[in-house]
Design a protein with these regions (language model features):
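Short, surface-exposed ligand-recognition loops at beta-strand->loop->(often short) alpha-helix junctions
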Residues: 90-98
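Short loop/turn segments at strand-loop or loop-helix junctions that form parts
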Residues: 7-13, 91-92, 117-118
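Catalytic phosphate/metal-binding cores of nucleic-acid and nucleotide-processing enzymes, i.e., regions
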Residues: 79, 102-108
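DNA replication initiation on ssDNA origins
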Residues: 1-85
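Histidine-centered divalent-metal-coordination microenvironment in nucleic-acid enzymes
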Residues: 88-89, 109-119
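Short, acidic loop-beta-alpha module within alpha/beta folds
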Residues: 97-102, 113
Length: 119
């Protein structure tokens, strides 16, 4: 049987300028958010955008977000309550995303808890 860990981190409502979290969430909560229908209209609109600067502005104002690194009173390193034990990796402009995903999933030195392509 696979062992699970209850990681805990802060969840924030859009826009990105909002620095106070509304609650603590875990990996399963984020997974459900990603695969659910809550952000589907925003995701579809974002994927139609041709300009990367327009897309960046849109993401900052239309998507909720979380701080995978831990629980915070406010989104500021000095306001950290507890580190989650997670490390968040963000890869931009990857040519072969399928190959990179497999490398991460099969890596011998760390376990991948959640892996997704952001909108």
């Amino acid at each position: 049987m696979m062992e699970t860990t209850d990681y805990c981190f802060s969840f924030f409502r859009k826009p990105i300028q909002n620095i106070e979290p509304i609650r603590a969430v875990g990996i399963v909560d984020v997974y459900r958010y990603i695969i659910g229908h809550y952000a589907q209209p925003q995701t579809e609109a974002l994927r139609l955008m041709l300009s990367s600067s327009e897309a960046k502005r849109y993401k900052a104002t239309h998507f909720d977000y979380c701080t995978f690194s831990g629980l915070f009173r406010k989104r500021n390193e000095k306001e950290l309550i507890m580190h989650s034990g997670l490390m968040c990796l963000d890869f931009d402009h990857v040519e072969n995303i399928v190959e990179l995903k497999q490398q991460l999933l099969n890596h011998e030195y760390f376990d991948t808890e959640l892996l997704f392509v952001s909108p």
